[in-house]
Amino acid sequence: LRVVGGNLTAKQLAKIAEVAEKFGDGHVHLTSRQSVEIPFVKLEQIDAVKAALAEGDVEPGVCGPRVRTVTACQGEAICPSGCIDTYALAKELDARYFARELPHKFKFGITGCQNNCLKSEENDWGIKGGIQVKWREEDCIQCGVCTKACRSGAITHEDGKITVGESKCNFCGRCVK
């Protein structure tokens, strides 16, 4: 089924459960790509299944050489480490590219921070959120919290100035949260 960024509404979940009971064997499979499958549906019932799912705003997914379900972690909306709105980006990519035919299957994966829970590099096009930090003297109160928060040791504090070592920074954003 088409699941954008791993998000389904309660209405969609209820309809999927209803269809699984009526046309399948009463269970669903949650795929590794954040989608849902209803196994054991008879081929001659596919049109009825699609119609029933549409009543709950659920659309079929795709297979074969096409752009697949866009996966995303929960991003900044829920995760304290999140740096970007992963769901908004997933919806945008889905609207532009979902089911587009290509020479081979194609997967998007969006992760909101450097924790990389979605393993963005394992997708054909992976997006990893981050924050590029610049020190502004007029905004700094010299408290040292940013230096302590930086796990990669990219931030140093000397002679009243903060330096962000770009080669060490992993763009996690902990220093500004």
Predicted region positions:
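Hydrophobic face of beta-strands forming the core of extended beta-sheets/solenoids
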Residues: 135, 164-165
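Short cysteine/histidine-rich zinc-coordinating motifs and their immediately flanking basic loops
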Residues: 84-86, 124-128, 151-163
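Small-residue-enriched alpha-helical segments and adjacent helix-cap loops
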Residues: 2-133, 139
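Iron-sulfur cluster-binding cysteine motifs and their immediate structural context
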Residues: 145-162, 168-177
